[in-house]
UniProtKB/Swiss-Prot annotation:
Its main location: secreted. Keywords: Extinct organism protein, Extracellular matrix, Glycoprotein, Hydroxylation, Secreted. Residues 82-94, 657-666, 917-928 have a biased composition (Basic and acidic residues). These protein fragments were extracted from ancient femur bone collected at Rampart Cave in Arizona, USA and around 28580 years old. The modification 4-hydroxyproline is found at residues 9, 12, 45, 51, 380, 383. The keyword Glycoprotein applies. One of its GO terms (cellular component) is extracellular region. Prolines at the third position of the tripeptide repeating unit (G-X-Y) are hydroxylated in some or all of the chains. This is Collagen alpha-2(I) chain. The lineage of its organism: Eukaryota, Metazoa, Chordata, Craniata, Vertebrata.
Amino acid sequence: GGFDFSFLPQPPQEKGHDGGRYYRAKQGVGLGPGPMGLMGPRGPPGASGAPGPQGFPAGEPGEPGQTGPAGARGPAGPPGKADGHPGKPGRPGERGVVGPQGARGFPGTPGLPGFKGIRGHNGLDGLKGQPGAPGVKGEPGAPGENGTPGQTGARGLPGERGRVGAPGPAGARGSDGSVGPVGPAGPIGSAGPPGFPGAPGPKGELGPVGNTGPSGPAGPRGEQGLPGVSGPVGPPGNPGANGLTGAKGAAGLPGVAGAPGLPGPRGIPGPVGASGATGARGLVGEPGPAGSKGESGNKGEPGSAGPQGPPGSSGEEGKRGPNGESGSTGPTGPPGLRGGPGSRGLPGADGRAGVIGPAGARGASGPAGVRGPSGDTGRPGEPGLMGARGLPGSPGNVGPAGKEGPAGLPGIDGRPGPIGPAGARGEAGNIGFPGPKGPAGDPGKGEKGHAGLAGNRGQGGKGEQGPAGPPGFQGLPGPAGTTGEAGKPGERGIPGEFGLPGPAGPRGERGPPGESGAVGPSGAIGSRGPSGPPGPDGNKGEPGVVGAPGTAGPAGSGGLPGERGAAGMPGGKGEKGELGLRGEVGTTGRDGARGAPGAVGAPGPAGATGDRGEAGAAGPAGPAGPRGSPGERGEVGPAGPNGFAGPAGAAGQPGAKGERGTKGPKGENGIVGPTGPVGSAGPAGPNGPAGPAGSRGDGGPPGATGFPGAAGRTGPPGPSGITGPPGPPGAAGKEGLRGPRGDQGPVGRTGETGAGGPPGFTGEKGPSGEPGTAGPPGTAGPQGLLGAPGILGLPGSRGERGLPGVAGAVGEPGPLGIGPPGARGPPGAVGSPGVNGAPGNPGSDGPPGRDGLPGHKGERGYAGNAGPVGAAGAPGPHGTVGPAGKHGNRGEPGPVGSVGPVGALGPRGPSGPQGIRGDKGEPGDKGPRGLPGLKGHNGLQGLPGLAGQHGDQGPGPVGPAGPRGPAGPSGPAGKDGRTGHPGAVGPAGIRGSGGGYDFGYEGDFYRA
């Protein structure tokens, strides 16, 4: 029952309700037909309102109520939030039970005027109704006044052709009025918009039955005009007398539809009609579109950097990285200015004896230096393997141990004085910066003396390692020992008998710094002096490119061995550095002309490491010396401190103290790479930290030279053990066979160089080990194969570091003694790095000495500035690999480095798993009302509706039927008459079931 307001905005359908495109008005009891309102203009579509409350069950269909005026447009609902999920379409609700017919409701608020529909098809002609019973002819009524013609409505869009509705309820029979004159056929007006059906007008009084007039000829069927606007309803005429019922004429063709009449006055409510059939279940409406996605918020300003986090925990010791590829040798830098030697520190543990190289060509003897006053006799050092003679340096006298003084200006190298008597072995001082090479003196003319026996190793004390002070002034050259006669220049002397190194002579007073002399030819490397105290470890730097091997220089005449140079100031112990990459072992080079100091020998047994002090400024790193061939490889330990260099070559200018860099990530220890050719010896670099002391084994007898053994794999470094007192060095073992070159491992990742701290005080030197037995002096033979490493001695206890003393002057070098290599002493502490000297020609490599006990790995020091890369020396013999040292304490993490550039964009990673669907968001606020949509296309014409069935006669306020008259004869079919004026609208009869007509808009049908 009721009208179909499907064009109104539809409320959302709840589950279980009859949804669909048809918005059916609730049925209720009407109060009678009302006047029909004019079609209003099309309003913009309204926003969806909130769902209305559940309506009452359907009432019994009542008579259509009068159409009220078009209601005002309701306010737009609040904007919905745009982030709601689109609802899923609800399932069609179950068909509700047809409720009892409710009482006719009051007329509802008139809905919004519908959109103008497309003109519908002409409906099929309704079935001819059964002829009604002839009514009693009433009195002819007074002719009614012609109503004012209604205004012609604007032509509406053609509606779809509606289905032929069922015949409407029969209106109550009105009184027959007098037949008015047939008016002229008016022009077919434009079809107005379909208005709502007007309510029936008030029932007219029954007039007397009039006589039936003759049937007029049926007029031609007029075209169906569009519904025009109804004219006003005229007042009812006076009822005439009931006329006799005339014979029913033949049904004429439908005439042109007149314009709909204006709504009549509201009638009295009729009785409640019977319950109408339940309408068909509506289609479920489609879900509304999802709300538009909210716009992304503006990107916030980048947040300020947070505070620096605490330093991260120390990582595990990385495995040793493999050796890097050999880089090309960089150009030799110019000799730097000679730095003033630092005050002498307490002696560090002896370094490993270097490999004795064949005597180089003897250089011209330099002029004798002024003899300095004799210093205190130092303790005899461990005999080291004889290296190629270097140019004599200018050690100063050993002064009393003082605190580090400021660095003095470089002095001029003094001439070497005569070799003084061997004094007691003094405490090893800090390693000073290498001084510039002096001019080569004329060869001495004395005979070579026998090498003295090695003195006992001194006891080491235990001192706190203080910060290394700046280098002291270079002392005056000490008294030189008696100079032997220099050999003729260039002539190779017959190697003398190998004597044990005698005790070092006293240091002379330090003379004023001299000007750097011109670089003389490289002399033979002198005996390896005891290592100075360990200097600070530098931060692990990036591995430099390995220089290409240089060609061996021509053999120079062997110079006389110089006295041990003054020890430089000890650098403070730095933080524990990363394990460096093992360099390639070089092959033995030929005797070169006298050049800069030869390769540093293998470290001796480790002395006790002093407490970590502040690191001194690191000097530039010198070029790598020749590597020995690897023996059987034990666990690779950190490198022990280097022994004292031979007489220094011309010193390079000390580099500026670098700022401490941020500590980089610890690199993995790489596998030991294959031995590369040895480059030409550069100036001695800073000593590395002492390796951990291994257990001292008994010295085995010298073994026969074996074949080279295969290199063993590097084991992981063990934890640091407690440093024991240094034991006496074991006897030298036999040389082992030369092992094959190991594969070069990948380069480990280095940390960033930290800024050098101030040098710390050096600890006292640990006790010396027992000297190894010296072999009988013999003539130098060809270099033999490497012997197997001897058993390592027990580590010595860590001595306290004393204050550095002033270095004495270097005496003239004595004759080069020839003898078997002595036992390797413990490595001394690492001193401050010296200034790089200009690289000299490579000296001849001697046979490798035995491996000493590894010392404890020292704390990591600050890295110094890198020195110029020296020319590659001739390959030296393969040295034996020392036992692995224990890892030292890990250094404090450096400050965070600056952020590097953004790396290249990596490949896109795989898509992550689909996240869990988030909770449904709160519905957003309803957006502002949109602009009215464009008018849709005209809908397709609907199919012609089926003819409706006859409605049942309802119990309307119909008057009593008159007696049925006799049926008159059917007259001939008359012609179509002209359209008459619209008569008064009769009262609505009972509504027929079904039928109606549809008019479409935008493809949808609306049922009226």
